[in-house]
Every structure is written in structure tokens, then in C-alpha cells.
């Protein structure tokens, strides 16, 4: 239970890091930490295979996207975490999270154990279910993501040579 609280706090910090967005480099780091912590929370709930697959797919997609993103929008002097502008964004987002917690979650009953909440869901998530019912959709989703990547890269190239060029 303590590890879930630590993961939740780390996930919240990574979301604030992405929302403050000082530079594409730091936002990519915040997303990677958020993906890792989110998959760690799934692993604590007993969904080890699903968390591993989500982690690999998400980080693979982010690797491709953030390899091209800094190249397309490179800044000579990016804002770092120590700048006052980024610090003010972090303070505003933390204030909004605290207000939302007091307004919406303050009166809710917290679960004593993770098993109370995710115990019934564990049996439906497994290797056989992912590949039996959703195998074709995983394949189609992979192709759609590849085509979307190629379309975006071709649209953003302008009049220069694009990503689909003869070598």
C-alpha cells in the first residue's frame, strides 16, 4: 500500500512536470517517468503482462515522436527547471491539484487494500485475453500508428526532402 502511494505521488509530479512544459526535452522526460510509474502501479495491482506491454508500446512510440520533436522545434536556449516562469507554472498546477483534492476527494472513503478495488478485474486481464480477443486490433493499431507517423513527417517537411526519400 505504501508503494502505491509513492507511485501515485510520483505520477502526480510527472504530470505536473509535463504540464509546466519548459522545453520538449524535459516534457519527454516527464512523460517517460509518468509511463514508468503508471505501469508500476499496474504491476502492483497484479497486471504484470499488461503493464509490460503498455510500457514497451508507449515508450517505443515516445522514442520515435520525441526523436523528431526536438529536431523540428530545437531551441538554442531552452527553459530549464530552475527558471522562474517554470517554477510559477509548477506552483499554479500544485495549487490546482490541492484545490481539486479538497473539493472532490476530501469526503471520499479510501480503500484499505488494493485488492478491494482491483480484485475482480485481475482474472480478465491476461496474455490469452489480449491476443485472443484483441489480437487483430493490436495489429491494426500498429499499422495505423506507423501510417500516422509517416503522414505527419511528410506534412511537416515542407519543400525539403522528406522521410520517404530514395537513398
From Swiss-Prot:
GO terms for cellular component: mitochondrial membrane. Its main location: mitochondrion. Its EC number is 7.1.1.2. It catalyses: a ubiquinone + NADH + 5 H(+)(in) = a ubiquinol + NAD(+) + 4 H(+)(out). It is a multi-pass membrane protein. GO terms for molecular function: NADH dehydrogenase (ubiquinone) activity. InterPro entries: ComplexI_Subunit6, NADH_UbQ/plastoQ_OxRdtase_su6, Nuo/plastoQ_OxRdtase_6_NuoJ. It is found in: Mitochondrion membrane. Keywords: Electron transport, Membrane, Mitochondrion, NAD, Respiratory chain, Translocase, Transmembrane, Transmembrane helix, Transport, Ubiquinone. The chain crosses the membrane at residues 1-21, 23-43, 47-67, 86-106, 133-153. It holds the Pfam family Oxidored_q3. It comes from the Eukaryota. Belongs to the complex I subunit 6 family. Core subunit of the mitochondrial membrane respiratory chain NADH dehydrogenase (Complex I) that is believed to belong to the minimal assembly required for catalysis. Complex I functions in the transfer of electrons from NADH to the respiratory chain. The immediate electron acceptor for the enzyme is believed to be ubiquinone. This is NADH-ubiquinone oxidoreductase chain 6. It comes from Polypterus ornatipinnis. The lineage of its organism: Eukaryota, Metazoa, Chordata, Craniata, Vertebrata. The gene is MT-ND6.
Amino acid at each position: 500500500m505504501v508503494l502505491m502511494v509513492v507511485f501515485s505521488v510520483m505520477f502526480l509530479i510527472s504530470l505536473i512536470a509535463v504540464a509546466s512544459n519548459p522545453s520538449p526535452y524535459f516534457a519527454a522526460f516527464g512523460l517517460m517517468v509518468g509511463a514508468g510509474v503508471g505501469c508500476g502501479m499496474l504491476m502492483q495491482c497484479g497486471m504484470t503482462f499488461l503493464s509490460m506491454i503498455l510500457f514497451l508500446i508507449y515508450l517505443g512510440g515516445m522514442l520515435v515522436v520525441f526523436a523528431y520533436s526536438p529536431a523540428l522545434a530545437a531551441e538554442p536556449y531552452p527553459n530549464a527547471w530552475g527558471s522562474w516562469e517554470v517554477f510559477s507554472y509548477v506552483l499554479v498546477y500544485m495549487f490546482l491539484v490541492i484545490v481539486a483534492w479538497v473539493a472532490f476527494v476530501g469526503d471520499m472513503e479510501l480503500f484499505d487494500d488494493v485488492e478491494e478495488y482491483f480484485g475482480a478485474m485481475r482474472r480478465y486481464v491476461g496474455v490469452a485475453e489480449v491476443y485472443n480477443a484483441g489480437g487483430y486490433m493490436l495489429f491494426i493499431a500498429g499499422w495505423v500508428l506507423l501510417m500516422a507517423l509517416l503522414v505527419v513527417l511528410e506534412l511537416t517537411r515542407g519543400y525539403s526532402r522528406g522521410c520517404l526519400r530514395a537513398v
